[in-house]
Amino acid sequence: MPVSTTLLQSDLPGLPLRHRGKVRDVFDIPRDRLPADAPPGDYLLMVATDRLSAFDVVLPDPIPGKGEMLCQVSNFWFHKTEHLMPNHLVDIRVEQVLPEGVDPALYAKRAVVTRKLKPVPVEAIARGYVIGSGWKDYQRTGKISGIELPDGLRQAEKLPEPIFTPSTKAAVGDHDENIDFDAMVKTVGAELAERVRDATLRIYRFAADFAAERGILLADTKFEFGTDADGRLYIMDEMLTPDSSRYWPADQYEPGTSPPSYDKQFVRDYLETLDWGKTAPGPRLPADVIDRTRAKYAEALQRLAGISVD
């Protein structure tokens, strides 16, 4: 899979920009840009750029091809798990909705057409290991998101059972905050909260088993869900990518340590060496950090989905 031109920001005349996130640009698709046989409803074009964020700050340097790799990992998992949960993808090709004069090759592997859904205003996180913010919470309270855990767990230790730990959905530049299930119920209602929790854990278990067969541990992951006009629940946005998940090589896993991961850890480690306040604007990245980070994303894509990057 040759990497296409690096894309830091997408601008598509004729498609109204709905949202520009840390990585994805989302556009409304006017009805006159849809194929004549498109089912009734509203649709979005979601573009995965090559932007990179760390510590909730979008950095000035992109990772070449990252958006394509993220999009392909997501699409792989959306199709792999559609027997477990419907997703936001629809059968409309990207080139059918792009404005005139836009090179389809630039967007073919980094964009998807999706249903327009009402987002559930909570991040749905599944954890199988005690690491990251969960490890910090556990050290302080013996709990993660209000869930009591056994005493004496070490950093990165596998939990007795996967747990559901929701968080707030922060705006770009702000920080998500872990909340307990009762707080989620107050936000979205008991019935929807239970559906999201059950779907999150069901998908996590399936994906963790699948990844383990390929020598990868899925430590934790974050999902986003949305509902349609009839209240049907869909998984949306991205799915089980190195940006939304913590993947570890099984042969390098050791409880009591912070295992290496298939993500932007090289970037975070480099930034921690700088005198930087973790606020915008972010610092520039050295070429070797960019190259090593890209290689980690490419390795994850190949090992999980069997797709090689040239």
Curated annotation (Swiss-Prot):
Family: Belongs to the SAICAR synthetase family.
Gene: purC
Gene Ontology BP term (one): 'de novo' IMP biosynthetic process
UniProt cross-references to SUPFAM superfamilies, sorted A to Z: SAICAR synthase-like (SSF56104)
Reactions mediated catalytically: 5-amino-1-(5-phospho-D-ribosyl)imidazole-4-carboxylate + L-aspartate + ATP = (2S)-2-[5-amino-1-(5-phospho-beta-D-ribosyl)imidazole-4-carboxamido]succinate + ADP + phosphate + 2 H(+)
Keyword Ligase part of the UniProt annotation: yes
Name this polypeptide is given: Phosphoribosylaminoimidazole-succinocarboxamide synthase
GO MF assignments: ATP binding; phosphoribosylaminoimidazolesuccinocarboxamide synthase activity
Class in the EC hierarchy, top level: ligase
CDD domains: SAICAR_synt_Sc
Domain of life where this protein originates: Bacteria
EC code: 6.3.2.6
Pathway the protein acts in: Purine metabolism; IMP biosynthesis via de novo pathway; 5-amino-1-(5-phospho-D-ribosyl)imidazole-4-carboxamide from 5-amino-1-(5-phospho-D-ribosyl)imidazole-4-carboxylate: step 1/2
Pfam families cross-referenced by the UniProt entry: SAICAR_synt
Keywords, in A-Z order: ATP-binding, Ligase, Nucleotide-binding, Purine biosynthesis
Chain segments annotated as coiled-coil in the UniProt record: none
The UniProt record lists the keyword ATP-binding: yes
PANTHER family in alphabetical order: PHOSPHORIBOSYLAMINOIMIDAZOLE-SUCCINOCARBOXAMIDE SYNTHASE
Gene Ontology annotations for the cellular component aspect, listed alphabetically: cytoplasm
